[in-house]
Amino acid sequence: MRLSIAAALAAFALTTGTSTAAQDSFEDQVAEYVRTFPHRLTYDYTVRFTGGDPRNLNRWIGNGEPALVRAGADVVPRTNNDTYYKAAALFLEDGPVVIESSTPAVDRFNSFQLIDDRNANYRNIVFPSGKYTLYFGARPKQFEGEAIKVPSALTVVIARVEVRNKNDPDDVAAAKQLFAGLEISGAQPSQFPKLDLPAHPADVVAEAHRRMDEVFATVPFTRTVAGPGREPGRDVPYLYHAAGTKGGWGGPVPEHSAYEAMLLDGQGNVMKGSNGTYALTTEAPPVDAFWSVTVYDTERGGFLHPNEADRYHYNDTTALENANGTVTFTFKRGCGAADRNCLEVPAGRFDVVARYYLPREEIISGAWTLPRIELVAAEPPR
């Protein structure tokens, strides 16, 4: 597998190896790289997920066993840790693919998220039931369940199933039963898709990523997500879309789940574990499903931070409430047994993402947001 991934990535480099026109200005080149970045990253993840092997397309990635993402599985930045995942990269040139929820449930959040080759959502199906036929091009004369037209031949399906408490055997069993009923079937692609985009000079790429990182740190994540009625370049600026793709590829539309990313504290400063203890106190967010708070290691690319407790998030089931019904989260190095709702952070920079599943209108509109994270106990210099 390691060799096939390397070969596929080498092929990716070759297909994007033509240089940009010399007459293009620096700003034009930055703008073009930003515009095409979501295509590049979606293709890159497709290669990583499948090893560049067409036999791994149109099927669930990996062994399909339910597991929460843990530290060390560093593939997609800011992957959530509060649901089971299934994902598949589909190539529909050779025919449609059918996805199915054969054991549907409405008492536990679950969904099919469908994104195109630009990391733009074209459909989010919450509480799926039965079969859905995904097709590209002409509508098939015969199909199973609901027929869904896909805007690109290459598409990704992400399935999520809520896990309320990984330490509760009954809850885990119920989540696994629902997860096991998520199925996929379709034609075996005859070839792996190719991407043909121009290469860009290093200074252009560096400047584009600097701008993406600045946007991701300062613009609400919901404003970076593309989907129905949120077309990249028209409703969502290309730079915003690229920033959201880099910082949280595969993010769904806010009506499915709204994400609130916090890379700065309430004073506008970057958060570092070496600074001391940080805290956040909030009332329950207005959602119709569930919500969670997860911590990430910013300096390691926005991945989960390894810790002995193997805990990366709290949700509305596992978090302990204060006497007045609010919830206080603590972020620090070396969480102890007496620390309530404590998430361990690295010595360097960290960030926090709150997820609101089936958020109400006040979250979608931005009228309701979390209070800011504050440094509550400074650590003396060492």
Positions of predicted regions on the chain:
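Positively charged n-region of N-terminal signal peptides that target proteins for export
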Residues: M1-S4
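Bacterial N-terminal signal peptides
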Residues: A6-T16
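Bacterial Sec-dependent signal peptides at the C-terminal "C-region" and cleavage site
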Residues: L14-D24
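A compositional/structural signature for long, glycine/proline-rich flexible linkers
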Residues: A22-R382
